[in-house]
């Protein structure tokens, strides 16, 4: 059955339900590589800590996310899911989860209009019920309810879209308010909290909290050590070059590769490219990160210096217009340009509208400038590792998603301990718990601390072992 043609009766929207069996086989493989999630299922399945939780999920609909969804359901939650990126869905994963009865709204290559339609659908629960928790990646689900509720009171907030994505979002909100003037505030009032996956979404949350605009409590999953120092670093170290090579078949060795941004994501990208014997150059605004890059042997330059010389460009900053039209105009013919930050505006793709676009294959485009020079743009400036490959490996996502699951349990079952409008991180003992759950899979054995040793360094025998301010 093709779900796209069956929407009148089906509470889901995926590309092709005939892919479900394939997706299920890959889910089975992923489970063997996700020990954290499987251990959490075993620990909490009987107690059902998420019973009564209705989770609106906005996160890349991949095989690994399928294991997360089924973990949440195994712990008692009801879930509705959409992808947080128009290119990141794995259609067989979406079909496999939809086949279990969990509503999924995600298609690889969906339009922006469909993207925001699907994000609305995760808040449209049957029988007059509403979501009471959000699991977010990038903050779009959180943004949607807050912006829509503001628009109910002041329509002028939708008057001046600053991008094509905002134009589509604002139009979707206006259409929804025309049908139900209280659609957003009704749903916003029911949310007990959000757990946020990624750096960009966390920045949004802190901005909202600082302005007094955040309507519920939030847990910043990204800054758990077992997320940011593993997913962001080790995940990108493997998935970046996977995406670039699947898209272009380029030989990386000997090329000059520029990594814009040397945070955890940038560090992983630089390591990956250097391991393939690229000459790695780094651009940075932060003197500490710049010094780290220089001490690793990377050349620290400006984008203006790098543009005419490099062969591969990767943005990993979380900022916007890091690579501009002027930079791309200065690049060599056939330079490869891609982004591994959450949003598509790190590269100023909108400034290329007057260029000729030639699709080489899905998510790989030649952009031809008026002088005939071409660059190769990957995933139209969106996440290259998910647009051109399948994202991070299952094992490292087990660590991230174990944090997400624990954060959902924490925020749902102990909601009174978290103040509305504030952003929290998981306590250190839970961070260490996530790490413990993954050691056996790698054959790692911890040394046990004796009581006299614990007394000597003034820590509990069972941890936590580091103060909150410790930098891993």
From Swiss-Prot:
Binding of NAD(+), residues: 198-200, 232, 261-266, 284, 319, 340-342, 385
Q: How is the cofactor bound?
A: Binds 1 NAD(+) per subunit.
What UniProt keywords are attached to this protein's entry? Cytoplasm, Hydrolase, NAD, One-carbon metabolism
Q: Name one GO molecular function term.
A: adenosylhomocysteinase activity
**Record SUPFAM superfamilies:** Formate/glycerate dehydrogenase catalytic domain-like, NAD(P)-binding Rossmann-fold domains
Q: Which domain of life is it from?
A: Bacteria
Instruction: Say where the protein is mainly found.
Output: cytoplasm
**One matching Pfam family, short form?**
AdoHcyase_NAD
What EC number(s) is this enzyme filed under? 3.13.2.1
Q: Report the enzyme's class at the first EC level.
A: hydrolase
Q: Which GO terms describe its cellular component?
A: cytosol
| Cofactor(s) this protein requires | NAD(+)
Q: Where in the cell is it found?
A: Cytoplasm
Q: Which reaction does it catalyse?
A: S-adenosyl-L-homocysteine + H2O = L-homocysteine + adenosine
- Report the InterPro entries cross-referenced here: Adenosylhomocyst_ase-like_sf, Adenosylhomocysteinase-like, Ado_hCys_hydrolase_NAD-bd, NAD(P)-bd_dom_sf, S-Ado-L-homoCys_hydrolase_CS
Named in its record, the pathway it takes part in is: Amino-acid biosynthesis; L-homocysteine biosynthesis; L-homocysteine from S-adenosyl-L-homocysteine: step 1/1
What biological-process terms (Gene Ontology) are attached?
Answer: L-homocysteine biosynthetic process; one-carbon metabolic process; S-adenosylmethionine cycle
Record-annotated residues binding substrate?
62, 137, 197, 227, 231
Regarding protein family, the annotation reads:
Belongs to the adenosylhomocysteinase family.
PANTHER family, A to Z: ADENOSYLHOMOCYSTEINASE (PTHR23420:SF0)
Outline what the protein does: May play a key role in the regulation of the intracellular concentration of adenosylhomocysteine.
The identity of this protein, by name, is Adenosylhomocysteinase
């Amino acid at each position: 059955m093709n779900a796209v043609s069956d929407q009148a009766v089906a509470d889901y929207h995926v590309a092709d339900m005939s892919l479900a069996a394939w997706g299920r086989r890959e889910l089975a493989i992923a489970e063997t590589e996700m020990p954290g999630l499987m251990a959490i299922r075993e620990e909490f399945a009987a107690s059902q800590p998420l019973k009564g939780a209705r989770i609106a999920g906005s996160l890349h609909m991949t095989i690994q996310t399928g294991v997360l969804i089924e973990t949440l359901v195994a712990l008692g939650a009801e879930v509705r899911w959409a992808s947080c990126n128009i290119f990141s869905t794995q259609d067989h994963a979406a079909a496999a989860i939809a086949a279990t009865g969990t509503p999924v709204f995600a298609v690889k290559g969906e339009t922006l209009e469909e993207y925001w339609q699907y994000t609305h659908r995760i808040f449209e629960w049957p029988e007059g019920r509403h979501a009471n928790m959000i699991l977010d990646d990038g903050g779009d689900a959180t943004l949607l309810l807050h912006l829509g509720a503001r628009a109910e009171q002041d329509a002028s907030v939708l008057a001046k879209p600053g991008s094509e994505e905002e134009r589509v979002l604002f139009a979707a909100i206006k259409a929804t308010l025309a049908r139900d003037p209280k659609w957003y505030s009704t749903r916003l009032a029911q949310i007990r909290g959000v757990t946020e996956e990624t750096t960009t979404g966390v920045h949004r949350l802190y901005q909202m909290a600082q302005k007094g605009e955040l309507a519920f409590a939030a847990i910043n999953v990204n800054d758990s050590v077992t997320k940011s120092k593993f997913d962001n670093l080790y995940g990108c170290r493997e998935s970046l070059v996977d995406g670039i090579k699947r898209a272009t078949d380029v030989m990386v060795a000997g090329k000059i590769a520029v990594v814009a941004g040397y945070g955890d994501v940038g560090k992983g990208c630089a390591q990956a490219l250097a391991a393939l014997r690229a000459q790695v150059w780094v651009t940075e605004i932060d003197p500490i990160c710049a010094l780290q890059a220089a001490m690793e042997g990377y050349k620290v330059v400006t984008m203006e210096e790098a543009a005419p010389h490099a062969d591969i460009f990767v943005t990993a900053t979380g900022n916007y217009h890091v690579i501009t039209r002027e930079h791309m105009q200065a690049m060599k013919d056939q330079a490869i340009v891609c982004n591994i930050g959450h949003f598509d505006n790190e590269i100023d793709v909108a400034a290329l509208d007057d260029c000729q676009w030639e699709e080489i294959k899905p998510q790989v485009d030649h952009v031809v400038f008026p002088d005939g020079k071409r660059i190769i743009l990957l995933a139209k400036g969106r996440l290259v590792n998910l647009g051109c490959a399948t994202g991070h490996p299952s094992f490292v996502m087990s660590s991230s998603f174990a944090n997400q699951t624990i954060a959902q349990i924490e925020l749902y079952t102990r909601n009174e301990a978290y103040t509305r409008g504030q952003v929290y991180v998981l306590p250190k003992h839970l961070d260490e718990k996530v790490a413990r759950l993954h050691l056996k899979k790698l054959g790692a054995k911890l040394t046990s601390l004796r009581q006299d040793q614990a007394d000597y360094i003034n820590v509990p025998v069972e941890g936590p072992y580091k103060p909150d301010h410790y930098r891993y």
